Amino acid sequence: MKFLIDECLSLKLVDLAVERRYVQSSHVVRLGKSGWKDWELTPFILDGDWTFVTKNSIDFRGKADNPGAKGQYSSVPIHAGLVCLNGPEGMDRALQLDLFEIALVELDRDPDIINQVIEVTLAANDEIQVLRYDLPPE
């Protein structure tokens, strides 16, 4: 598995992925794709068999109450997985790293993420929630 980290997230997430032996992981900026629109980036993600990591969850999985109804992955029949890190507006690097670490622990438990989403969310009550589901829904 290799992660592609969205440009809205810290480059340090790549370092964490590499430390955890996901050595082919990279960042949108490092690959020269900075500024690409989501619809331009999606074919690159899919063709490269990347597991995409973003905080722009709604753009890729659609609304939280109806994932897959809209968003870049709504019409994708097969993908290498999507990791959504959900936190407050302007989430800092430390929180991004904490949420990504939790996602990596979830992947240690079950590494098969093909056609799945892992969402790690810092809820309003400061609890961390981990949600894993199929996308597209079966």
Label the model's feature ranges.
Residues 104-138:
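Charged phosphate-binding loop/patch that engages nucleotide di/tri-phosphates or the phosphate backbone
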Residues 5-7, 54-56, 85:
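Short His-Asn-centered micro-motif
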Residues 38, 45-67:
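Acidic, metal-binding active-site segment of PIN/NYN-like and related structure-specific nucleases
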Residues 5-48:
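N-terminal first-folded block
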Residues 1-2:
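Extreme N-terminal starter segment of soluble prokaryotic enzymes
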Residues 60-102:
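Mid-chain, well-packed structural core segment of small domains
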Residues 11, 59-61, 126:
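Glycine-rich nucleotide phosphate-binding loop and flanking beta-alpha elements
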